[in-house]
């Protein structure tokens, strides 16, 4: 799983976790011939070659229809987008974990409608020129707080009736979040508070963020990477899957550090805290 964060998804996260904003557009820096020449050669045959996620310049194989996709994976092929499961309660978490699926683009906007389209839990792939656009979300109506209050009151009444009739609440409580998931939530909260000026976001604010790469169990993936910056691949390193701390013997490189070779019993034991 590649650990390069898509700027397009970062901005999509802002629209999910922040207030309604107007349409935001920014361009990645252009790729020079020198930077492209420094990219490693592809060792596999690709149905379609695209730029790596984020603002990187190196070529990667695009994901095909039905293949898994997400924040840390190559983008989907032309005509496809990365979607979470339709019934998912946490679509963003699925995309961060790379558990989305590449599917055909679905245009849900009615023809000739002036209403803005609501954002779904999809990864919007940047174009090859580096342009990323995030559709606006519909602002809440004036009576939204009242509706929300009524819904909460209805739920409380229903819960009281269920207790009176000694019926258990069918919804099981959420399991305690892991350290990686807690760190992820903190980063998403920071993203939602980024200030946007003139409908453009300062890329430096996005570059400075590190979104932890969590696996489906909530643990840290062995390989963690920073965003691609100015066409250069982000630095990658290996971490303890339980604590997220760097493995002392692993390197910090712009590429795949092959983290499995640095694993030993100590890193796999959650009770052992590695040295700083």
From Swiss-Prot:
Disulfide bonds join 28-55, 31-57, 39-58, 46-61, 69-82, 76-102, 180-214, 225-236, 238-259. In embryos at 24 hpf, initially expressed in the lens and cranial region, and at 48 and 72 hpf in the brain boundary vasculature. Expression in these regions persists throughout the hatching period and by 96 hpf expression is most abundant in the liver. In both male and female adults, highest expression is in the liver with modest expression in the brain. In male but not females adults, expressed at a low level in muscle and gonad. Also expressed in the adult intestine. It comes from Danio rerio (Zebrafish). GO terms for biological process: angiogenesis; heart development; negative regulation of cell population proliferation; negative regulation of developmental growth; negative regulation of DNA replication; regulation of insulin-like growth factor receptor signaling pathway. This is Insulin-like growth factor-binding protein 2-A. Induction: Expression increases in response to prolonged fasting but decreases in response to growth hormone (GH). Keywords: Developmental protein, Disulfide bond, Growth factor binding, Growth regulation, Secreted, Signal. IGF-binding proteins prolong the half-life of the IGFs and have been shown to either inhibit or stimulate the growth promoting effects of the IGFs on cell culture. They alter the interaction of IGFs with their cell surface receptors. A motif (Cell attachment site) lies at residues 254-256. One of its GO terms (molecular function) is insulin-like growth factor I binding. The keyword Cytoplasm does not apply.
């Amino acid at each position: 799983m590649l650990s390069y964060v898509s700027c397009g998804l970062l901005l999509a996260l802002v629209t999910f976790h922040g207030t309604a904003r107007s349409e935001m557009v920014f361009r990645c820096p252009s790729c020079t011939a020198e930077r492209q020449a420094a990219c490693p050669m592809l060792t596999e045959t690709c149905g379609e070659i695209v730029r790596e996620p984020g603002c990187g310049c190196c070529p990667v194989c695009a994901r095909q229809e039905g293949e898994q996709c997400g924040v840390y994976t190559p983008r989907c092929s032309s005509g496809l987008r990365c979607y979470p499961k339709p019934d998912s309660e946490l679509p963003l978490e699925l995309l961060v974990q790379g558990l989305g699926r590449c599917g055909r683009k679905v245009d849900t906007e009615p023809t000739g409608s002036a209403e803005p389209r609501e954002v779904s839990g999809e990864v919007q792939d940047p174009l090859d020129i580096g342009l990323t656009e995030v559709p606006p979300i519909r602002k809440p109506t004036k009576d939204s707080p009242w509706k929300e209050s009524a819904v909460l009151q209805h739920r409380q009444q229903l819960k009281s009736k269920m207790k009176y009739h000694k019926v258990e609440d069918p919804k099981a409580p959420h399991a305690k979040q892991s350290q990686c998931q807690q760190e992820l939530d903190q980063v998403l909260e920071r993203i939602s508070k980024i200030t946007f000026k003139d409908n453009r976001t300062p890329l430096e604010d996005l570059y400075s963020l590190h979104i932890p790469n969590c696996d489906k169990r909530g643990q840290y993936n062995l390989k963690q990477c920073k965003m691609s910056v100015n066409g250069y691949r982000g630095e990658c390193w290996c971490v303890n899957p339980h604590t997220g701390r760097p493995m002392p013997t692993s390197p910090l490189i712009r590429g795949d550090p092959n983290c499995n070779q640095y694993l030993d019993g100590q890193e796999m034991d959650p009770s052992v805290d590695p040295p700083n």
